A protein has these predicted regions:
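A generic structural signal for secondary-structure junctions
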Residues: 12-13, 70, 141
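C-terminal auxiliary extensions adjacent to catalytic cores
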Residues: 108-167
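Mid-to-C-terminal Rossmann-like scaffold of FAD/NAD(P)H-dependent oxidoreductases
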Residues: 4, 38-134
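An exposure/low-complexity boundary signal
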Residues: 61, 65-68, 160-169
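Residue-level detector of family-conserved "landmark" positions at structurally sensitive sites
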Residues: 18, 77-79, 149
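FAD-site-proximal beta/loop scaffold in flavoenzymes
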Residues: 1-64, 155
């Protein structure tokens, strides 16, 4: 599926595979904002501008664009690529980018691979039990420094107890 970007392109706006927006969801044309599946934004896990046609990203972009159109000074810097699917009776979830050092575990039923560098979680691939994948997604989206939590515990048994008491309260 390719987004229809002709409207913005025809009036001189910057485009690539999608409409280029900045961290305030503004296009290259002053006072014109865009949000959703046809926008390219910065993937915080890789630093690259890309299309990420995903509901959570579109929702947050819409909030950002709406706030800025109403005069606020709001920044959206939490876009990450994510996918989740059920396949052959297994749940599969991925998020972020697959670069950096690797933590890997597999027990025959479940598979987990975490990618991290520069004291941050960059991405993950989980097959099987994806119940706690939201914790990893939040760590990526919030750019949480890994030295502020028990990273070994987060890798093996993700849960709120791995976070400092300050973060949990």
């Amino acid at each position: 599926v390719r987004p229809n970007i002709s409207l913005i392109k025809d009036i001189g706006g910057k485009t690539n595979k999608g409409i280029i927006i900045d961290e305030k969801c503004q296009t290259s044309i002053p006072d014109i904002y865009a949000a959703g599946d046809y926008c390219e934004s910065i993937d915080i896990s890789s630093g690259e501008s890309k299309l990420m046609a995903l509901l959570p990203n579109a929702y947050m972009q819409g909030e950002c664009a709406g706030m800025n159109m109403s005069g606020a000074d709001y920044v959206f810097q939490k876009a990450i690529p994510m996918n989740s699917i059920g396949l052959f009776g297994k749940h599969v979830m991925t998020a972020g980018t697959y670069s950096g050092q690797v933590y890997h575990e597999s027990d025959g039923k479940n598979y987990k691979k975490l990618f991290y560098s520069d004291n941050r979680l960059n991405g993950f691939i989980i097959i099987g039990n994806i119940e706690k994948a939201g914790i990893y997604t939040a760590l990526i989206r919030e750019r949480t420094p890994l030295d502020t939590l028990d990273f070994e515990l987060i890798c093996k048994k993700p849960g709120l107890m791995a976070f400092s008491k300050k973060v949990r309260t």
